[in-house]
């Protein structure tokens, strides 16, 4: 089954329009220069900036990934040694 070229063009156009929309200041209400007059908006902007500045720790995901990637090896060992004898 061949994917039509129109679908590719549509996906690219939607992706570009979405990235351009996120780049405008209207999409970011916390980047509004008038927000400094409102203390609640300023506190919200500071909280968002602080949350975006802190990176997510990758350490909790590593043991889970190691476990999931080891499952095919364990399955192979069980089939070779226990099932097929």
From Swiss-Prot:
GO terms for molecular function: sodium channel regulator activity; toxin activity. Disulfide bonds: none annotated. It comes from the Eukaryota. Expressed by the venom gland. Transmembrane segments: none annotated. The keyword NAD does not apply. Its main location: secreted. GO terms for cellular component: extracellular region. Keywords: Amidation, Ion channel impairing toxin, Neurotoxin, Secreted, Signal, Toxin, Voltage-gated sodium channel impairing toxin. It is found in: Secreted. Residues 1-23 form the signal peptide. The modification Asparagine amide is found at residue 84. Vertebrate-selective toxin that causes pain by targeting voltage-gated sodium channels. Belongs to the formicidae venom clade 1 family. This is Myrmicitoxin(1)-Pr2d.
